[in-house]
C-alpha cells in the first residue's frame, strides 16, 4: 500500500517541476529582453539612462501641464473646440 501512495505523488511532483521550469524560462526570457532594451537605450542616448530625458513622460507633452485623463466620448465629455477627442 505504501508504494501505491508514493506512486500517486510522483506525477504531482513532476508537474510541479515542469511548472517551475516553465515559469523560470519566462522570467529569464523577460529579464534578457529588458536588459537588451536598457542596453539599446543607453547606447542610442535615449531612455532611462539619459539625464536629458524625463524619467516619466508627461501626457500633455514637454512643458505642458497635466490636465488629467484624455477626453473621450466613452467618458461622456466633450473636448474643447479645436482639439481631438
Curated annotation (Swiss-Prot):
Residues 1-12 are cytoplasmic. Its main location: membrane. Coiled coil: none annotated. GO terms for cellular component: membrane. The chain crosses the membrane at residues 13-34. It is found in: Membrane. Disulfide bonds: none annotated. Keywords: Membrane, Transmembrane, Transmembrane helix. Residues 35-85 are extracellular. It is a single-pass type II membrane protein. Associated with pathogen defense. This is Protein WIR1B. It comes from Triticum aestivum (Wheat). The gene is WIR1B.
